[in-house]
């Protein structure tokens, strides 16, 4: 511990050691060691040789001294680190020990009922650590055990006393402190035992049956608790006050610590600069020593002669002037002085650093042990004290209200418990009902599952039966589809016939309208038979197509299972349709030719029969009557077709094909009757025209008409034959169709029976599913009812809780309102006035405090800046003085008249100057071979590379930053 206060004493021998060594080395060099000087011609040469040897020895001694200094410095740094760690550990132990003692003291005052709180106040003063002495290094201090009894005695730092005392005194003091902490712990144990005895006595009195003893015990306990409450309240006030003062002091000391740290950083930067300068000077000195040693070795080895005033070269001899040696010695002395000055500056900076660290530690100690009495004098503390007294009175009132509320709470709890018991009983009964219903539903569900299994088995059996009857059904469906295709083809042919009929009717109407005169009646009679044969031709073609379609249908029924034959049949039908279209085109061309001929005849007859215009009008009236009759017939046929369509729509699918065939047969018969009627009409017209016309032209026309009639009669006979063939084919197809229908009816009956069985199974399955769904719905409804009952119970419980809370709130509000109304109304006006005044004062004080704090911070910043600038100016001033003294010496040497050099000396000086310019200013050893492209300063490549690698990427002369691409080599020839 003696090393804590004696840091400077340890550092002083380090400064005084090197000079002693120097003298010792000099003495040894002059007395002990023998020097071989070689051949000497004069006393001056002898002096020069001796000086050279001394200089060499001095350089060696300087190197030894520097090595010793480095070792000592490292040793001192290690000791300082060790001492700092020891001090830190001691400070931590002392801090926690003092905190332990303080906590024990507070606990004793908390539980020691015999002493008052005034003793604690005196003890608290003793706990405060004052400002440490200037020669102490401790961060936290502690009072001795003697200071506990007497709080007004001056308090000394425990660590400072330990540092100033001997080892025996240290042991005795530490033993005393340990004994004091032991005594404090034993006191805590005794106090705890007393409290335990008192509690046991009170519990015995309370457990005894006598009412008087119980009342006494309760009164005693109340008084004890009231005293304890008062003591605790005072203790909390004291601790809060202490915390407040400590926080304020902490803020102040934190600012001081920040300023000290900034100063320390400035000093550290200055120390680094000085260390850099010292290293630079040392390197220069070493370089000079090496150079001097090399020169001396050359002189000794080659036997160069040295003359006092000569400066020329004589056949292998080099003349060295004695003045140069003097100059070199003077430079060496200057460098030594510079080194001593730098060393002194470093020592001063180290002392300043130590002082700053001690101040920093003192400030930390002050921060941890701030004065607590200042808080009591502040208006904020007084205001808080008054507010605390008001709040304490209010707390007493609230306690009374709380007792009343507790009584009400016990009553409401009893009622609430009764209600809860009733609700629980209802819930248990509902649970029982629900269980019975759930059991019933499960039984019904099991029955439904059994029925479902039975139905599933039956359904599988029916499916197997249906799979057996599957191929028969497929064959029937295939036959039905083929018949449907045949029916579709017949429908297409019927539609085609209808279209042809309409075209024929439209052509008829056109031809009848064209016959405009009576003279053209004969022509029209000739034209009608021309048209009729075309119509007959078309009808015969239609009948032929109809018969071919029937034949194709029979082939389809026979060969329905063969797809290749169907394709051939389609191909044949397409070929037939193409042939029919070709025939129709040929017939149209013939009709066109006939129409052209008839038009020519009309043109020739029109000129002759203009006079017979009146007869033509009568014939036109007859033609109109005939057209009206035909219109009526067409309307009747339309009605018949509508009836057939209705019958076809109302008929089932099995009979639709039959209906189509019957309709086609009726239609063909009606067309035959129409054709016969037309034939009769034409014959009648022919007879009438034969009677009327006797001319040669009429005879020619009659002959032509007769030819046409013969042609038509032949065609009619052909049509009759085809009709008879078609009727026979129709009978055959009808019989085949009836057979197929009977088979279809049988198969349909079988299908219906199977469908009925399937429908029965499906209906039973649907019924079972419906029953299952109903049971599920009933179960869900019961679950919903249970949930609703639970939610109702929860809601009732919440309502009860809310009502209880409302009761508590209302009762507390009523009690507090009645008691506080009177007091609050009286104190409200006074408090308002005081609050307004206090708020105004607080605002003013806050504004003043903020302004003062701002000014203080500004002043502190300015002081720090001024101190930094002053230190920098002093440093620059010292450097400038050193430069001035060095330059003065040079000036004095240059002003001397005896020192006027000769030409060789001037040349040598110039060479030296050029060499100095070409050598790197950083290391002063290597040549300049690298340039910085940012500022164009020249150095050696090794120095620039080391600066770049060590991240000191600034120019040594102008501090301009440079990067990897901002320097390169140059070659000076």
UniProtKB/Swiss-Prot annotation:
Q: According to the UniProt entry, where is the signal peptide?
A: none
Name the EC number(s): 2.3.2.27
Keywords, in A-Z order = Acetylation, Chromatin regulator, Coiled coil, Metal-binding, Nucleus, Phosphoprotein, Transferase, Ubl conjugation pathway, Zinc, Zinc-finger
Residues in RING-type zinc fingers run 920-959
For whether the record's keyword set contains Nucleus, the answer is yes
> What compartments host this protein?
Nucleus
Positions with biased composition (Basic and acidic residues): 139-151, 527-544, 553-620
Ranges in coiled-coil conformation: 43-90, 168-378, 429-896
Q: Which Pfam families match?
A: zf-C3HC4 (PF00097)
Q: Does the keyword Electron transport apply?
A: no
Question: What ranges does the record give for the region Disordered, renumbered to this chain?
Answer: 1-37, 128-153, 507-620
- Record-listed Phosphoserine modification sites: 41, 136, 138, 522, 560
* Molecular function terms, GO-annotated: chromatin binding; histone binding; histone H2B C-terminal K residue ubiquitin ligase activity; identical protein binding; mRNA 3'-UTR binding; p53 binding; transcription coactivator activity; ubiquitin protein ligase binding
Protein's GO biological process:
negative regulation of cell migration; positive regulation of transcription by RNA polymerase II; protein polyubiquitination; ubiquitin-dependent protein catabolic process
PTM annotation (N6-acetyllysine): residues: 21, 348, 510
The family note in this entry says:
Belongs to the BRE1 family.
Q: What does this protein do?
A: Component of the RNF20/40 E3 ubiquitin-protein ligase complex that mediates monoubiquitination of 'Lys-120' of histone H2B (H2BK120ub1). H2BK120ub1 gives a specific tag for epigenetic transcriptional activation and is also prerequisite for histone H3 'Lys-4' and 'Lys-79' methylation (H3K4me and H3K79me, respectively). It thereby plays a central role in histone code and gene regulation. The RNF20/40 complex forms a H2B ubiquitin ligase complex in cooperation with the E2 enzyme UBE2A or UBE2B; reports about the cooperation with UBE2E1/UBCH are contradictory.
Q: What is this protein called?
A: E3 ubiquitin-protein ligase BRE1A
Native source species: Mus musculus
């Amino acid at each position: 511990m003696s090393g804590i206060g004696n840091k400077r004493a340890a550092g002083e021998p380090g400064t005084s050691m090197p000079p002693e060594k120097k003298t010792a080395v000099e003495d040894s060099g002059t007395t002990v060691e023998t020097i071989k000087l070689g051949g000497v011609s004069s006393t001056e040469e002898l002096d020069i040789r001796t000086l050279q040897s001394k200089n060499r020895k001095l350089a060696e001694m300087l190197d030894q001294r520097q090595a010793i200094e480095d070792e000592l410095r490292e040793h001192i740094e290690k000791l300082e680190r060790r001492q700092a760690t020891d001090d830190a550990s001691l400070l931590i132990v002392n801090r926690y020990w003092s905190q332990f003692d303080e906590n024990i003291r507070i606990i004793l005052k908390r539980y020691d009922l015999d002493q008052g709180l005034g003793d604690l106040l005196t003890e608290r003063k003793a706990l405060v650590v004052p400002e440490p002495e200037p020669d102490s290094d401790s961060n936290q201090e502690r009072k001795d055990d003697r200071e506990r009894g007497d709080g007004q005695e001056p308090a000394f730092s425990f660590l400072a006393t330990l540092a100033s005392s001997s080892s025996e005194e240290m042991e005795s003091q530490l033993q005393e402190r340990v004994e004091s902490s032991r005594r404090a712990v034993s006191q805590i144990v005794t106090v705890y035992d007393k409290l335990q005895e008192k509690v046991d006595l009170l519990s015995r009195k309370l457990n005894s049956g006598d009412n008087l003893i119980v009342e006494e015990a309760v009164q005693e306990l109340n008084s004890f608790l009231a005293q304890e409450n008062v003591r605790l309240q005072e203790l909390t006030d004291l601790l809060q006050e202490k915390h407040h003062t400590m926080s304020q002091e902490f803020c102040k000391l934190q600012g001081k610590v920040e300023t000290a740290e900034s100063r320390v950083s400035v000093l550290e930067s200055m120390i680094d600069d000085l260390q850099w300068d010292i290293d630079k000077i040392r390197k220069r000195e070493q370089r000079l020593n090496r150079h001097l040693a090399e020169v001396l070795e050359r002189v000794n080895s080659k036997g160069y002669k040295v003359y006092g005033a000569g400066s020329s070269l004589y056949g292998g001899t080099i003349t060295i002037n004695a003045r140069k040696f003097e100059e070199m010695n003077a430079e060496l002395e200057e460098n030594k002085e510079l080194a001593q000055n730098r060393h002194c500056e470093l020592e001063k900076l180290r002392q300043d650093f130590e002082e700053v660290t001690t101040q920093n530690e003192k400030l930390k100690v002050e921060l941890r042990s701030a004065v607590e009495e200042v808080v009591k004098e502040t208006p904020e503390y007084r205001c808080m004290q008054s507010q605390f007294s008001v709040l304490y009175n209010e707390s007493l009132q609230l306690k009374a209200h709380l007792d009343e509320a507790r009584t009400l709470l016990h009553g409401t709890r009893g009622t609430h418990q009764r209600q809860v018991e009733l609700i629980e009983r209802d819930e248990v009964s509902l649970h029982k009902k629900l269980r019975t219903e759930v059991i019933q539903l499960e039984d019904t569900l099991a029955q439904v599952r059994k029925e479902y299994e039975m139905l599933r088995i039956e359904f599988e059996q029916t499916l197997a039966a249906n799979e057996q009857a599957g191929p028969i059904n497929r064959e029937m469906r295939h036959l039905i589809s083929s018949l449907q295709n045949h029916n579709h083809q017949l429908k297409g042919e019927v539609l085609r016939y209808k279209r042809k009929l309409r075209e024929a009717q439209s052509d008829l109407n056109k031809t009848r309208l064209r016959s405009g005169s009576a003279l053209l009646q004969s022509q029209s009679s000739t034209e009608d038979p021309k048209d009729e044969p075309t119509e007959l031709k078309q009808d015969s073609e239609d009948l032929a197509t109809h018969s071919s379609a029937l034949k194709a249908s029979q082939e389809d029924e026979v060969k329905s299972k063969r797809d290749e034959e169907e394709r051939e049949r389609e191909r044949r039908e397409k070929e037939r349709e193409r042939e029919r279209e070709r025939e129709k085109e040929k017939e149209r061309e013939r009709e066109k030719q006939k129409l052209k001929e008839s038009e020519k005849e009309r043109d020739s007859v029109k000129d002759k029969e203009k006079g017979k215009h009146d007869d033509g009008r009568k014939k036109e009236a007859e033609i109109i009557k005939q057209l009206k009759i035909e219109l009526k017939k067409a309307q009747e046929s339309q009605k018949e077709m509508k009836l057939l369509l209705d019958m076809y729509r109302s008929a089932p699918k099995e009979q639709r094909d039959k209906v189509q065939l019957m309709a086609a047969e009726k239609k063909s018969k009606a067309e035959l009757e129409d054709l016969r009627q037309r034939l009769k009409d034409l014959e009648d017209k022919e007879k009438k025209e034969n009677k009327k016309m006797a001319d040669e032209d009429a005879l020619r026309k009659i002959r032509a008409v007769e030819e046409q009639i013969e042609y038509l009669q032949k065609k009619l006979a052909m049509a009759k034959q085809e009709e008879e063939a078609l009727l026979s084919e129709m009978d055959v197809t009808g019989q085949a169709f009836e057979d197929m229908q009977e088979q279809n009816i049988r198969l349909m009956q079988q299908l219906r029976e199977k469908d009925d069985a399937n429908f029965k199974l499906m209906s039973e399955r649907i019924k079972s599913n419906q029953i299952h769904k109903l049971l599920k719905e009933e179960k869900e409804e019961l679950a919903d009812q249970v949930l609703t009952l639970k939610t109702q119970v929860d809601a009732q419980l919440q309502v009860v809780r809310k009502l209880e809370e409302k009761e508590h709130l209302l009762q507390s509000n009523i009690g507090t309102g009645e008691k506080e109304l009177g007091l609050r109304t009286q104190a409200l006006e006074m408090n308002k006035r005081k609050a307004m005044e206090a708020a105004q004062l607080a605002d003013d004080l806050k504004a003043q405090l903020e302004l003062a704090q701002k000014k203080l911070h500004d002043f502190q910043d300015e002081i720090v800046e001024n101190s930094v600038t002053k230190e920098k100016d002093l440093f620059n001033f010292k450097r400038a003085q050193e430069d001035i003294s060095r330059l003065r010496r040079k000036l004095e040497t240059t002003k001397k008249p005896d020192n006027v050099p000769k030409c060789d000396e001037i040349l040598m000086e110039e060479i030296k100057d050029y060499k100095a310019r070409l050598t790197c200013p950083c290391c002063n050893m290597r040549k300049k071979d690298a340039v910085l492209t940012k500022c164009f300063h020249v150095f050696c490549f090794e120095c620039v590379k080391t600066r770049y690698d060590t991240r000191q990427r600034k120019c040594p002369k102008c501090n301009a930053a440079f990067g990897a691409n901002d320097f390169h080599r140059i070659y000076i020839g």
